[in-house]
Amino acid sequence: MTIDKRVDCIKLAKAVIRQTRNDVLISKTQMTDIAARCNRNRTTVSRALDAEDMTLSMWFASVSESEIDPLQLITEKIQEQSALADALENATANNANSKEEN
């Protein structure tokens, strides 16, 4: 699978981290367990999840400790962001067509 060039990579990354945060909270994974896996402190992990930005090693630790399938998570978010890019492109094209008709 590749990432469509129309997909905003920043939005994609934030969506992946946001879903990871939700899954961590749902699974009741301890921040101290994630922190131990990535050699960070608990507060740093918690803040990174809230900020929707983190290092790859911290993300791997988060999905591992929460028993999340990282490939499935990324695949779902790529598909969602691709669908949003398609919808935006179609809406823009439809708007341009309606202006031409007027």
Name each model-derived stretch.
Residues 51-64:
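Short, basic-rich loop-to-helix N-cap that marks the start of a DNA-contacting helix
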Residues 52, 66, 77-81:
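The DNA-recognition helices of helix-turn-helix-type DNA-binding domains
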Residues 1-7, 74-102:
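Short, charged recognition helix plus adjacent turn
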Residues 31, 42, 56-59:
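Helix-turn-helix DNA-binding elements, focusing on the entry/boundary residues of the two helices
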Residues 38-54:
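Recognition helix of helix-turn-helix/homeodomain-like DNA-binding domains
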Residues 1-33:
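A short, Lys/Arg-rich alpha-helix, primarily the initiator
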Residues 46-47, 60, 74:
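Key DNA-contacting residues within the recognition helix of helix-turn-helix
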